[in-house]
């Protein structure tokens, strides 16, 4: 794309923003939702507006989500989180008196498609604002495109170091930096009494920018505590048959197992192999998958196989935050299920909307340059995941790391030990099917 063409597109986008701002003032309301099911397809729909916003131009927010492909489960959860936020912001008066409309395009979990999608959302659809996609894998390429157009890029699932290694000033992750995810778990194992502490541990992780950065610090903590790492393997992200890897882990009889997973199928495959191999580690944590509620339980054969399994994160359905509990209740009312079915993806997406709304309201503007400057100002904002304060890179330095464990069909906060809301860790992990 030529420089002159890019300037023309930016001018067009600014003109669209100006048109909306011309009518902006107080608060109004509407509800909105949108969905897309195929790569490159886009659908946007608005709910009924209240009398105060019914005749006002909507503010359109674009995003690319993985509604199919490898990240479909997470992408669909993100879509629900964005929709819940849009419904709530519109019910509360919209943004600057205008209803919000979501413009969602499916990227089919493809790094190349996500680039095409954000280019379309900004240069063709002229959406005034954009939200981030799911995963660091898709955040890295899309952030470069969004930066080229001068847009703020607030996201909730691109917390790996790779997302912040390009010197971009427009990217902001509302969630916990993934590099800290496994620290509470590693510290807990390392500080167990010597008679209870595992003597061996196995590590297997996908070659993914989300999973790999979580392990170096955790492994070092375990080794410093005298825990021997008897298996440490990085497997290709393209792997679909995990049986050989899981069998190799089981053969070590390691007393603790740390899995770098990005989805439910990965964890499910390991668990089913472990059951077949009669391998039951005293402690088992997976970086993603166990946080997926009903989808996880169904994939592994029910709650009895989930008992004692752990997952790191910065949020869970029982998080003691009034806004979080309201969101969980709204999710259950709209989509059914129980609070345990509301996974962290929903909260991450909802938080993105909250932070963007606070920035828009604080700056009284849809000017992306003003929003970027505000988010870099050191202000502390609030979300359903807790406080948000961005450092110079755009990472959330106020986020806290926790670990959660499935106990009696409920995902409970258990780490850090002694933290508000933490329950006793179930250790050793019960046998599969117990």
Give the ranges of each region predicted by the language model.
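Extracellular/periplasmic periplasmic-binding protein-like sensory domains
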Residues: 274-350, 361, 417-422, 428-433
């Amino acid at each position: 794309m030529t420089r002159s063409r890019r300037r023309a597109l930016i001018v067009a986008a600014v003109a669209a923003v100006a048109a909306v701002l011309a009518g902006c003032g107080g608060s109004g309301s509407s509800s909105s939702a949108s969905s897309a099911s195929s790569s490159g397809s886009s659908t946007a729909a608005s709910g009924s507006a209240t009398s105060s916003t019914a005749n006002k131009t909507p503010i359109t927010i674009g995003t690319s989500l993985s509604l199919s492909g490898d990240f479909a489960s997470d992408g669909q959860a993100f879509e629900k989180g964005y929709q819940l936020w849009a419904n709530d912001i519109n019910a509360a008066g919209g943004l600057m008196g205008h209803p919000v409309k979501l413009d969602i395009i499916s990227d089919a979990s493809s790094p190349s498609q996500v680039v095409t999608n954000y280019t379309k959302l900004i240069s063709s659809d002229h959406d005034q604002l954009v939200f981030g996609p799911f995963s660091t894998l898709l955040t890295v390429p899309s952030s470069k495109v969004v930066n080229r157009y001068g847009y703020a890029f607030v996201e909730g699932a691109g917390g790996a170091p790779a997302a912040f290694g390009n010197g971009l000033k427009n990217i902001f992750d509302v969630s916990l930096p993934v590099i800290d995810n496994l620290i509470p778990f590693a510290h807990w194992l390392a500080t167990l009494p010597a008679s209870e502490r595992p003597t061996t541990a196995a590590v297997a992780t996908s070659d993914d920018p989300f999973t790999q950065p979580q392990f170096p610090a955790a492994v070092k903590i375990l080794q410093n505590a005298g825990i021997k790492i008897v298996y440490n393997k990085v497997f290709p992200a393209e792997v679909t048959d995990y049986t050989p890897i899981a069998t190799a882990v089981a053969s070590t009889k390691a007393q603790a197992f740390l899995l770098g997973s990005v989805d439910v199928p990965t964890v499910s495959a390991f668990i089913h192999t472990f059951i077949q191999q009669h391998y039951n580690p005293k402690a088992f944590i997976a970086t993603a998958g166990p946080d997926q509620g009903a989808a996880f339980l169904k994939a592994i054969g029910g709650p009895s196989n989930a008992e004692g399994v752990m997952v790191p994160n910065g949020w869970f359905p029982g998080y003691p935050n009034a806004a979080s509990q309201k969101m969980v209740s709204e999710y259950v009312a709209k989509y059914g299920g129980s609070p345990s079915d509301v996974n962290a993806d929903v909260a991450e997406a909802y938080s993105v909307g909250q932070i963007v709304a606070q920035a828009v309201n604080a700056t009284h503007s849809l000017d992306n340059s003003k929003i970027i400057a505000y988010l870099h100002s050191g202000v502390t904002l609030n979300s359903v995941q807790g406080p948000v304060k961005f450092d110079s890179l755009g990472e959330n330095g106020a986020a806290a790391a926790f670990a959660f464990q499935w106990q009696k069909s409920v995902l409970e906060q258990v780490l850090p030990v002694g933290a508000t809301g933490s329950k006793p860790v179930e250790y050793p992990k019960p046998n599969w099917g117990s």
